[in-house]
């Protein structure tokens, strides 16, 4: 069973004027207080009502609590999804399993390549985490900048991937 929840996962909505982006779209796992429920989906009714203003979904990394709801919710949003090479590879596998891979526009982000989408300029910045290829996002508009980290840790000797980009973090 997949009930919606307002506190189920990582999903963030960012607005500038009449334009929206989402950062992450994850699931949460139910506990013993919810027998018969395996996962919880985020409540996205608010953004569904503004779907025509939604420019895209940006993923910080490939953990389920950050991207696990896409296979269940994408049909309601139908926007491009952006992520690192590793995150997109994980998402492709999930989308293929449910027959959505050919329908979803997936765009790979690269560090220091700024993505211009509507009024947003989004710059991925390398971090480290317990999964390869995570990004923080520097989201800029004419009115200012938001720095969205997602999950992270500082690891100067990662087994996979790059060290955090300390220069960009300054």
Task: Identify the residue ranges that each predicted region occupies.
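Short glycine/serine/threonine-rich phosphate/pyrophosphate-binding segments
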Residues: 66-68, 134
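Pre-active-site segment of Zn-dependent metallo-hydrolases
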Residues: 16-59, 70-79, 83, 87, ...
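Histidine-centered divalent metal-coordination motifs
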Residues: 6, 56-66, 129
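Single conserved hydrophobic/aromatic residue that forms the stacking wall/gate
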Residues: 1-8, 12
């Amino acid at each position: 069973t997949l009930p919606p929840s307002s506190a189920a996962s990582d999903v963030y909505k960012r607005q500038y004027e009449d334009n929206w982006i989402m950062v992450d779209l994850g699931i949460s796992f139910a506990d013993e207080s919810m027998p018969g429920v395996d996962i919880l989906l985020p409540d996205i009714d608010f953004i569904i009502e503004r779907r025509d203003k939604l420019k895209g979904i940006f993923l910080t990394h490939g953990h389920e609590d950050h991207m696990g709801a896409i296979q269940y919710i994408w049909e309601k949003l139908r926007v491009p999804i952006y992520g690192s090479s590793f995150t997109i590879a994980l998402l492709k596998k999930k989308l293929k399993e449910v027959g959505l891979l050919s329908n979803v526009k997936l765009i790979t982000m690269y560090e220091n390549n700024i993505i211009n989408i509507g009024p947003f300029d989004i710059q991925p910045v390398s971090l480290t985490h317990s999964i390869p290829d995570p990004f923080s996002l520097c989201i800029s508009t004419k009115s200012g900048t938001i720095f969205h980290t997602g999950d992270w840790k500082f690891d100067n000797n990662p087994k996979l991937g790059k060290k955090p980009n300390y220069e960009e973090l300054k």
